[in-house]
Amino acid sequence: FAVTQIIGLILWAGISLLLFSLHQLFDIHFSGKCYAYIYYLCSITLALILFLGLLPQGEDKHNREPHSSEFLNGIIHYLFLPLTAGYLTVLYMYAARILVSWELPTGWVSWLIVALMTVCIAIQFGLYPARLENNKRFDNWIARWMPVLILPLLLLMTIGIVRRFNDYGITVNRLYLATLNGWFYFVCIGLFAIKARRINWIPISFAIIFLLTSALPVNYAGI
């Protein structure tokens, strides 16, 4: 039950961030009650449904082998992929608005894209075992083409970071954000190029960048 509670809270945080982004990007206001209703829906109702879905039925009651992979695939396909689609829709709508009005993106969009990429990488790792075992076409398509859909939005993030540099100068946090933006390009292009057949290089490359920017004697904090 604790696992389903955690999933419910993560989903609530994702939906709340999506609604808050609508307020920041399009000035669409949602009341505090709306966030409260979503919290109760995700942390109580949805968590309870997920917990009941985990209970074995029929002959599976006597099967002691775990079914965590099937549960995880269901969570990804029916909860987190639709949430990711929501993020993509909002960000592409904002990109279209920028092109029409010919204005620079706000700094908020960078953090929204960071959240989107975090979910994308989590989905890659969640789908990977099932992709190796079942080789489903839809899962392979998602693993390869989702990063391609995010690539144009990374350009939006880059423009937002450059604007922040020009308006407010260089800070340690903005240097980390710019480095993260460059790593996102590397991850998206890499996943597409190798058709997401291997993903172990993602945490390895992140660890290398972390060492170069934070752990070595010469790092961003010393600038």
Regions found by a protein language model. Give the residues of each.
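Membrane-interface interhelical loops and short amphipathic "cap" helices
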Residues: S21-Y37, K61-S68, M93-G107, N135, ...
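Membrane-embedded alpha-helical segments of integral membrane proteins
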Residues: G14, T118, W141-A196
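Alpha-helical transmembrane segments of integral membrane proteins
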Residues: V3-I10, C34-L41, S68-P82, W108-L112, ...
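Hydrophobic cores of alpha-helical transmembrane segments in multi-pass inner/ER membrane proteins
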Residues: I7-S16, Y39-Q57, T84-G86, V114-L127, ...
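Hydrophobic alpha-helical transmembrane segments in integral membrane proteins
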Residues: T213-I223
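Membrane-interfacial entry segments at the cytosolic side of transmembrane helices
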Residues: I194-A207
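Membrane-interface helix-loop-helix junctions at boundaries between adjacent transmembrane segments
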Residues: F1-I76
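Hydrophobic alpha-helical segments
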Residues: N73, H77, T84-R164
